[in-house]
Amino acid sequence: MARTTDDSKKAAPAAGTADEAQKQKALKMVLTQIKRNFGEGAIMRLGENTRIRVETVPSGAITLDLALGGGLPRGRVIEIYGPESSGKTTLALHAIAEIQKTGGVAAFVDAEHALDPAYAKVLGVNVDDLIISQPDTGEMAMEIVDQLVRSAAIDVIVIDSVAALVPRAEIEGEMGDAHVGLQARLMSQALRKITGNIGKTGCMVIFLNQLRSKIGVMYGNPETTTGGNALKFYASVRLDIRKAETLKKGQDEYGNRVRVKVVKNKVAPPFRKAEFDIIFGKGISSLGCILDLAVEMEIVERKGAWYSYGSERLGQGRENVLALLEENAAQAQEIEIKVREKIASGAAVPAAAVAAPDEGDDDLGDEEV
């Protein structure tokens, strides 16, 4: 009797191996069938291609690229939101300029009818090659975006802005009519339709969004973004951009210091922050970003208000040092090369550029109108 029990124990592993082989055979058959029906790449084991990685595009500010884990991801939905005049459009135009530098094609859906071609040109955008649309309705705007994405000929599309995507029913209706949830429904339907194609074609779609205040909120963050909840879910990256301080020379204002919080990031660690200068009429100060990182990485030494590079004293005050480096392009390039070499060698992102989000960062609700 004891021998029979022992025999059954020995037979059990063999039966388990047979079941496992049968399961693997069935799995192989179904994977082959799915690939035959839907094409190669429709389904795969994650370990089959260890080289799968998200390709990124520079944002125009190297400090923000570090906070994003390399830059703005291609083939993803990105939302940039913030108060008025915080730098949303400037950041989007810099992204367009960076893509055009590599030979990419860009489109700008100007729902606000407020794009300034002269300013875009100053930021480095090739306005002659920029594809622009000024749609009459929200449905028209999203249909144009869908067709551009499906063409697989566009590298980046900027929609400025979600708040200006007015549904057709609202435009054709009377001024006092209530249209509850129309815009949220429009965004939900459109994003369901275009998201799959965005991933297949590698097109980056950037939505610019505005902030609203929720009435009657006693606790928590009263701010909300427009367009419902769909964009929050479909976006791989959400950037909250705010003015941190005004840059002045004497009494004259010449720019803004802005702070960007990576509220959501599906392709790199979230909750990082980046700061950079936006100069009026010139855009993002790339030299300012390099100087800030050089100080953090101890390539440039700062003692009090004085800056030194090696044995050379650069000057007193950040503005004076930036002016000096603008005149001395060779020295500025030398510092930039050292900064980029440190980043490429895997140097940690400076602690000043990484921080936990402020309370309420990810509590932005969404209005349904």
Swiss-Prot record:
Subcellular location: Cytoplasm
GO function term, MF aspect, one: ATP hydrolysis activity
Signal peptide: none
Keyword Cell wall biogenesis/degradation: no
Gene3D superfamilies reported for this sequence: P-loop containing nucleotide triphosphate hydrolases
GO CC list: cytoplasm
Region of interest (Disordered), residue spans: 1-20, 350-369
NCBIfam families referenced in this protein's UniProt entry, alphabetically: tigrfam_recA (TIGR02012)
PANTHER family named in the record: MITOCHONDRIAL DNA REPAIR PROTEIN RECA HOMOLOG-RELATED, RECA
Function recorded in the entry: Can catalyze the hydrolysis of ATP in the presence of single-stranded DNA, the ATP-dependent uptake of single-stranded DNA by duplex DNA, and the ATP-dependent hybridization of homologous single-stranded DNAs. It interacts with LexA causing its activation and leading to its autocatalytic cleavage.
This protein's name: Protein RecA
Species in which this protein is naturally found: Gloeobacter violaceus (strain ATCC 29082 / PCC 7421)
Lineage: Bacteria, Bacillati, Cyanobacteriota, Cyanophyceae, Gloeobacterales
